[in-house]
Amino acid sequence: SCNTATCVTHRLAGLLSRSGGMVKSNFVPTDVGSEAF
């Protein structure tokens, strides 16, 4: 439904954040998580 590059980029970013958000948070911890390592 969206043809502009910006719209496609945002849609891809949204899909990645939803599908890989949990996995990324485990391997790329936040400030609190990084202190544990």
Swiss-Prot record:
One of its GO terms (cellular component) is extracellular region. Disulfide bonds join 2-7. The modification Phenylalanine amide is found at residue 37. GO terms for biological process: adenylate cyclase-activating G protein-coupled receptor signaling pathway; calcitonin gene-related peptide receptor signaling pathway. Keywords: Amidation, Disulfide bond, Hormone, Secreted. GO terms for molecular function: hormone activity. This is Calcitonin gene-related peptide 1. It comes from Sus scrofa (Pig).
